[in-house]
UniProtKB/Swiss-Prot annotation:
Molecular functions per Gene Ontology: oxidoreductase activity
Family named by the database record: Belongs to the clz3 oxygenase family.
Primary localization class, coarse: membrane
Glycosylation sites: N9, N249
GO cellular component terms given for this protein: membrane
Pathway in which this enzyme or protein is active: Secondary metabolite biosynthesis
Keyword Ribosomal protein annotated: no
Protein name from the UniProt record: Probable copper-dependent oxygenase clz3
Uppermost EC category: oxidoreductase
General function of this protein: Probable copper-dependent oxygenase; part of the gene cluster that mediates the biosynthesis of squalestatin S1 (SQS1, also known as zaragozic acid A), a heavily oxidized fungal polyketide that offers potent cholesterol lowering activity by targeting squalene synthase (SS). SQS1 is composed of a 2,8-dioxobicyclic[3.2.1]octane-3,4,5-tricarboxyclic acid core that is connected to two lipophilic polyketide arms.
Amino acid sequence: MSANLEYPNGTTADAENGMWLHHILFYNKANRDDICGEKKPGQRFFGSGNDRTPLDLTDGGKNKLGYHIGHNDQFFISVELMNMHFSSQVVVLTAHWKFVEEPYSKYELGTPYWFDVASCGRSDVPATNNAIFDFISPPVRLDFHGRMAYLSNHVHDGAFLHEVKKNGKTICSVNPQYSSADGADGIVHLSHVPPCSNAGPVAPGDEVSLTASYDTTKYKPMINEDGTLEPVMGVTLAYIVKGTAPVENDSGGRLYFAVPLAAIAFIALIISGGYVIYSAKQQKAWPKWLSRRQKYQSVGTEVESFITR
């Protein structure tokens, strides 16, 4: 999935020529947002900014991962565009999709989770000029087993580091990339925010948070028409494949099973050995007892034959 802003002739309209795709966000009205619930109008499953970084769930064809679109699903978008020119501009907002028709049994189902430094409010947070600062999201506690399959990250101009953490340990760390040429406003702008893929398993009780780090002494933030600073963002759209609890390693399982079996076998061996020793002693004592009894009471021929052994 990708979004773009173009001129009618098909050329890209971006910060270098004074047109900004500030942000675009796709909602699926048929599904409930898994983090914010009814606070959001639907499930957020795709977003993009002026960097136009695509959402490639397959990671270049390495993974069979997708987002399910039902027959009755309804999409709507939230979009903000900016024109840095003093005259009106005609532009076209485009969205490109790659999809697989049913059946798609070879693909895993990814569920989108929107982690945001602003939690469930507006994603905008205030910027500071000529400063180094961080925004840290409230931790989100998960209640299921699964796998962090793909993480799409979004920040604004001024960001130099974006990290996603699970239980305090970093599972995704990216450095936003900037264009080599100045934009129409004379400053460099974001050109790409790298994603992360296969960021590891998750389990009930795991807490996920993110940190968006900004350095506006090095990278100039965006400025509004009135000269004030444009708010910044820190977002990770994580596609999680839900599943069952991981199975213990087979070799370890067999070892745990083999130990009690070996103990049982060892005990049985001791018992059988003791029985053999006891039987041998009993076999030697039995004839003596019979011979003494023979003195006052006769015994059968089978017993007599046993005595003579």
